């Protein structure tokens, strides 16, 4: 804890210096600090703040979100440079997001937040984001990268994404948004709220459902249904001189009921019928429930000094019941995973024929004790419970003397999260393209363990502005304790007769330095350097305990992910033109990978050391409005481009990536991606067009030309949104995604080829009262 003591000392010295300088000012001098008001739930709050940081940042404003009316976070983020995403289900329900070349799978290497609170089910113990906040109910999305992100952890290599939910309005307002369209896709979004002198409230409900664009030959539904309910209530003192207090309580509930699967298609079937679902996935079903409770206390003495404290408790349950493998004979070696079957359907033809329903599986044993030895389809219940809870607080102090402005921020968070895995396999026979239950598995017979993390995080950030120069220095500290209790599949009741305890402890000091200089009234330059960090998994020390309490120690070594990251860029803000160009270079001394079923691994979620790696690239964005502000015609244009180059420096083998050779690229990272947005606004009418280009992507580690079997070809997708405003309250909307109805491949994982969303057309209404 010596490091934490140094951290506190540095913070105290910066505070003392600021107070001393302020006290030297003349008492009769009236000073005013101009600031952009940012709510306690936001980290940027405006495009102005994003453009004036010493590091890279982007603010997707409410106006931007409303233009295209997206419900898919993948489409929402497409305009942000430095962001890589690859689709999975076509609706953005469980996105795979990478920031500056971090691993994209389940967005597990970014700091994901909702209203400033960690949002992944168990961000330290099991960071894969199987829960992602519903983008359709967000009023803004904030993305910070590079040296801008030292306040936000634990993942500091690529960046952080903060989903900003609907705020309590300053006066009464209500909104109804409803749409319907292709594949019986329906969305209903309602919110209402008000504020009085000493209290305010907001309630919100979102219903989102679809029959899905994939289909079974027997017309079985392949869609989903989602519900989101949010309520906020705030009490506050009058905003007068002296200390002001406010307390806001946020409660949320969300659930999902979907027929989503990990089963994709063979190469030949994708070419013929890209939206087909094999009958072997007819029992695949996902059920989730999520709750959140957040209490936010704000104490503000003045515009210069305020304290914000959050208390939070989140729970998440999910049971993804999905096909795991197929067994053709009675012996154990006559069993193949879905990934193996779809990767080579010719060699595994007997297994594929059962999966696709071309042939029935055989039943050799009818007595109860031998039923589980029969051939058939093994469907795994991926039954998991999560919770995360904690308290985080920050203090902000602003001082001014002469031409110098000093902003100080200190933060502290104590956090606990847990994942409870209790999984089993059921066995089905295939008969006349219908799956019939043969054997009901025992809960806990496939995975039976609890992983818990306790984490203490603290940070200090100081921003000094002198004339045209801004210098930002920061320091973050992370102390993480991990414990896994594996009760083993032999002790499904968790009696404790035998369990394997795995522990790990990680400490990290994460410094950050950023510079921003206004070269002219319209041109500025910035640069930054910071340390990247990602928590390790629980695989350092294993304690095997028998029924007599005897412990056997086994040791392994897993280090945290660590990197040194550089960035430099220029910003132009000239009349109606705003541009930004950035170069970045991330040098990993140790990169971590994960054994995820979503990547075709075994699904243990255990992390492995990749070792040294380099990710470098460039980001560009330009925004232009040809017509002056007072013109009745608006034609906003935006172009963004990202180039990313990755290289792993070590050779190794893993369940997810197989054999990796030094020099291989990281899979599922776009080398080139480009987005163009074109808008036209005149009086009551709006038309917005989004054009997205994704270059070819490699789905397995490799180098040189991409082999066809490991390739996602380049594609261009066009989306269009039109609006007509009638009176002040009523709007008609018409949206089309994938306007040209292009059939395109988005992934070869977890098992087989998966298509992107085909043409979708949706009409709707928006009704507002305010």
Where would I find each of the regions flagged by the language model?
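Short acidic/polar hinge/loop motifs at secondary-structure boundaries
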Residues: 117-145
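Surface-exposed extracellular loop regions of Gram-negative outer-membrane beta-barrel proteins
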Residues: 257-259, 263-273, 481-493, 503, ...
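Membrane-embedded beta-barrel scaffold of Gram-negative outer-membrane proteins
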Residues: 300, 306-312, 316-320, 324, ...
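Extracytoplasmic beta-strand/coil segments of soluble accessory domains associated
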Residues: 74-121
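Transmembrane beta-barrel wall of Gram-negative outer-membrane proteins
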Residues: 180-209, 218-261, 285-289, 295-302, ...
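Gram-negative outer-membrane beta-barrel transporters
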Residues: 465, 578, 583-589, 604-701, ...
């Amino acid at each position: 804890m010596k490091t934490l003591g140094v951290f506190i000392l540095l913070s105290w010295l910066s505070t003392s210096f600021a107070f001393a300088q302020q006290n030297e000012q003349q008492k009769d001098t009236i000073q005013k600090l101009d600031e952009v008001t940012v709510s306690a739930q936001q980290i940027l709050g405006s495009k102005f703040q994003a453009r004036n940081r010493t590091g890279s940042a982007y603010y997707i404003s409410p106006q931007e979100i409303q233009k295209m009316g997206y419900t898919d976070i993948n489409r929402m983020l497409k305009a942000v440079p430095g962001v890589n995403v690859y689709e999975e289900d076509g609706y953005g329900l469980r996105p795979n997001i990478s920031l500056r070349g971090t691993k994209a799978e389940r967005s597990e290497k970014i700091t994901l937040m909702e209203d400033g609170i960690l949002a992944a089910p168990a961000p330290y113990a099991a960071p894969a984001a199987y829960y992602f906040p519903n983008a359709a109910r967000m009023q803004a999305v904030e993305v910070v990268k590079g040296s801008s992100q030292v306040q936000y952890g634990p993942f500091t290599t690529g960046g952080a994404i903060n989903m900003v939910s609907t705020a309590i309005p300053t006066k009464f307002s209500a909104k109804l948004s409803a749409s319907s369209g292709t594949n019986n896709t329906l969305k209903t979004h309602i919110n209402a709220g008000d504020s009085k002198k000493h209290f305010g409230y907001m309630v919100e409900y979102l219903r989102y459902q679809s029959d899905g664009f994939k289909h079974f030959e027997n017309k079985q539904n392949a869609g989903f249904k989602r519900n989101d309910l949010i309520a906020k209530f705030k009490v506050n003192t009058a905003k007068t001189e002296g200390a002001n207090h406010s307390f806001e309580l946020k409660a949320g509930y969300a659930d999902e009921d979907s027929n989503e699967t990990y089963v994709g298609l063979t190469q030949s079937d994708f070419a013929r019928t890209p939206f087909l679902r094999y009958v072997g996935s007819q029992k695949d079903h996902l059920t989730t429930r999520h709750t959140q409770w957040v209490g936010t206390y704000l104490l503000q003495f003045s515009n210069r000094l305020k304290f914000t404290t959050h208390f939070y408790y989140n729970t998440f349950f999910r049971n993804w019941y999905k096909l795991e493998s197929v067994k053709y004979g009675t012996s154990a070696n006559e069993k193949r995973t879905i990934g193996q079957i779809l990767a080579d359907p010719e060699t595994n033809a007997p297994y594929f024929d059962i999966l696709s329903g071309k042939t029935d599986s055989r039943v050799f044993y009818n007595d109860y004790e031998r039923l589980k030895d029969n051939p058939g389809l093994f469907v795994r219940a991926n039954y998991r419970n999560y919770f995360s809870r904690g308290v985080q607080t920050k203090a902000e102090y602003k001082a001014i003397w002469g031409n110098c402005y000093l902003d100080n921020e200190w933060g502290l968070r104590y956090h606990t999260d847990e994942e409870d895995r209790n999984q089993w396999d059921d066995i089905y026979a295939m008969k006349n393209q219908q799956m019939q239950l043969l054997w009901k598995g025992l809960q806990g017979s496939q995975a039976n363990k609890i992983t818990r993390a306790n984490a203490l995080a603290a940070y200090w950030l100081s921003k000094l502005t002198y004339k045209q120069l801004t210098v930002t220095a920061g320091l973050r500290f992370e102390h993480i304790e991990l414990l896994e209790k594996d009760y083993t599949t032999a002790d499904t009741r968790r009696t404790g007769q035998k369990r394997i305890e795995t522990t790990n402890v990680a400490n990290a000091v994460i410094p950050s330095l950023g510079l921003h200089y206004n070269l002219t009234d319209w041109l500025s330059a910035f640069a930054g350097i910071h340390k990247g960090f990602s928590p390790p998994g629980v695989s350092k020390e294993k304690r095997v305990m028998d029924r007599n309490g005897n412990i056997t120690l086994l040791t392994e070594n897993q280090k945290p992910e660590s990197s040194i990251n550089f960035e430099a860029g220029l910003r132009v803000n000239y009349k109606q033109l705003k541009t930004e160009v950035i170069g970045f270079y991330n040098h990993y001394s140790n990169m971590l990978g994960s054994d995820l079923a979503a990547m075709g691994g075994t699904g243990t979620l255990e992390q492995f050391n990749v070792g040294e790696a380099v990710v470098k690239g460039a980001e560009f964005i330009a925004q232009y409005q040809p017509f002056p502000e007072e013109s009745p015609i608006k034609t906003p244009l935006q172009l963004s481009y990202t180039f990313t180059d990755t290289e792993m420096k070590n050779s190794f083998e893993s369940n997810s990536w197989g054999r990796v050779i030094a020099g291989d690229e990281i899979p599922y990272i776009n080398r080139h991606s480009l987005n163009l947005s074109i808008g036209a606004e005149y009086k009551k009418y709006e038309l917005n067009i989004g054009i997205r280009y994704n270059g070819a992507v490699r789905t397995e580690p490799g180098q040189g030309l991409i082999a066809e079997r490991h390739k996602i070809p380049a594609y261009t997708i066009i989306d269009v949104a039109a609006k007509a405003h009638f009176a002040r309250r009523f709007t008609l909307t018409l949206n089309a995604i994938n306007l040209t109805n292009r059939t395109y491949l988005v992934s070869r994982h977890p098992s087989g080829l998966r298509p992107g969303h085909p043409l979708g057309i949706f009409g709707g209404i928006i009704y507002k009262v305010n």
